[in-house]
């Protein structure tokens, strides 16, 4: 039997951007180590397919599906409420949802595309953190992780807004770490 590097039994994770790719791999890994996970993305059918596959491979119902547009504050609040109803609490928040809504020069980007990238990649994380931290503080702490990108460290002639958003995520993380660290988050 292979020894696990760590045990996540009893941990309840809300994971955005989790129906495919890196998010799906994170969800599978979290469940493999014992966590319960709410899998969220915009498309419910993809979330459900991911949750079903994870539950089948684990032999337990540890993954739950919920569709949510990460750029909608109301939908994020509903996601948090669903997660607490299904899991009992949220001990860990993993913000993995992200978009690049424009490929081209910064001088050519329209306001709508700029706002969509910043809202999804930055503002949604800010909202979610503020939605989950009160209960984390009450329970003595928690964990918050936000996916950034190497793009945060490099200028790009075609991915400028995405790069800006991922650099902003790093600032968000540093500031929340300073603010929430004393609360064991």
Model-found features: residue ranges?
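Conserved glycine-rich cofactor-binding loop
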Residues: 12, 19-21
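Active-site loop immediately N-terminal to the catalytic Tyr-X3-Lys motif
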Residues: 106-107, 154-160, 182-183
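Conserved glycine-rich Rossmann-like NAD(P)H-binding loop of the short-chain dehydrogenase/reductase
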Residues: 33-49
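Alpha-helical segment proximal to the catalytic Tyr-Lys
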Residues: 134, 178-182
């Amino acid at each position: 039997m292979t020894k696990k590097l760590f045990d996540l039994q009893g941990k309840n994770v809300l994971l955005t951007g989790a129906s495919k790719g890196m998010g799906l791999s994170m969800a599978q890994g979290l469940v493999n180590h014992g966590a319960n996970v709410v899998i969220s993305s915009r498309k419910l059918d993809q979330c459900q397919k991911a949750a079903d596959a994870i539950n089948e491979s684990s032999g337990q119902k540890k993954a739950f599906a919920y569709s949510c547009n990460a750029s909608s504050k109301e939908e994020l609040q509903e996601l948090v409420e669903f997660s607490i109803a299904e899991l009992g609490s949220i001990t860990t928040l993993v913000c993995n949802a992200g978009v690049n809504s424009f490929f081209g020069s910064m001088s050519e980007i329209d306001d709508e595309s700029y706002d969509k990238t910043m809202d999804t990649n930055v503002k949604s994380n800010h909202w979610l953190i503020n939605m989950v931290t009160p209960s984390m503080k009450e329970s003595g702490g928690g964990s918050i992780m936000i996916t950034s990108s190497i793009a945060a460290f490099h200028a790009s002639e075609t991915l400028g807004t995405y790069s800006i958003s991922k650099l902003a995520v790093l600032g968000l993380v540093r500031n929340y770490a300073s603010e929430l660290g004393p609360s064991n988050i």
